[in-house]
């Protein structure tokens, strides 16, 4: 594995991995990690997981997805100065290159580390590689903290909380617009629900003090 992250990312960009077609990149990742004797390597479909087992008192999961959105005449990597162009170069083969470099260089990290390269993030959640691992091999993802290598312009975003999807059903009674008092407006009844959602301030997440 090269320590030139720009070249390493370009190499990954040139391996096509549109969602549901990540097998070539998964093969490449698995082969790149196979020589790391300090890592236990597992594979589930196109998901590749490599773990240290050093007996540390905590474990950090470092994860990144293999897939990209469909290309738009940008299949082949192109370097201009210190800028790399190509499908997935930002989201998120740059992160994958960093993960590979660290996995090769950190033989004895202060925390045990799980390196998780997973498939199908850019599509419906039900198809996601992370969900596939959680369903079939949840122990592979056990950890005390997780770092996702999504692009953030170099800013650490701590404690991302995901999303909540709620289905609310409000009944109503039809009426003519000239006589609204004869009916019951289901949309208006949603007002207090939206007020409560808007008023919720979220929660403060603290990681490692």
Mark where each language-model region is.
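Short, conserved micro-motifs enriched in small and acidic residues
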Residues: 84-97, 181-187
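Acidic-enriched catalytic cores of C-N bond-cleaving enzymes acting on peptides and small amides
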Residues: 178-209
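Acidic/histidine-rich catalytic neighborhood of metal-dependent amide-processing enzymes
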Residues: 97-165
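Active-site metal-binding loops of divalent metal-dependent hydrolases
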Residues: 66, 151, 177
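Predominant activation on well-ordered alpha-helical scaffold segments within soluble catalytic domains
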Residues: 10, 30, 97-104, 131-134, ...
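Acidic/His- and Gly-rich active-site-bordering loop/insert found
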Residues: 1-89, 108
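Metal-dependent peptidase/peptidase-like ectodomains
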Residues: 145-146, 155-189
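Acidic-glycine-rich active-site phosphate/pyrophosphate-binding loop
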Residues: 67-80, 143, 158-169
């Amino acid at each position: 594995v090269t320590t030139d992250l720009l070249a390493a990312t370009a190499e990954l960009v040139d391996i096509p991995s549109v969602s549901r077609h990540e097998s070539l990149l998964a093969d490449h990742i698995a082969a790149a990690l196979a020589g790391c004797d300090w890592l236990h390597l597992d594979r589930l479909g196109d998901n590749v997981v490599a773990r240290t087992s050093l007996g540390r008192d905590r474990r950090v999961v470092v994860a990144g997805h293999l897939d990209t959105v469909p290309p738009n005449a940008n299949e082949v990597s192109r370097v201009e100065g210190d800028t790399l162009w190509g499908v997935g170069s930002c989201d998120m083969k740059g992160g994958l290159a960093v993960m590979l470099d660290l996995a090769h260089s950190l033989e004895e990290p202060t925390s045990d580390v799980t390196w998780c390269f997973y498939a199908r993030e850019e599509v419906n959640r039900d198809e996601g590689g992370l969900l596939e691992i959680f369903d079939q091999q949840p122990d592979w993802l056990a950890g005390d903290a997780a770092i996702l290598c999504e692009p953030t312009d170099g800013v650490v975003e701590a404690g991302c909380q995901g999303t909540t999807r709620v289905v609310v059903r409000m009944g109503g009674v039809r009426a003519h617009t000239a006589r609204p008092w004869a009916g019951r407006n289901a949309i208006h009844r949603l007002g207090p629900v939206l007020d409560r959602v808007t008023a919720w301030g979220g929660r403060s997440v603290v990681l490692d003090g």
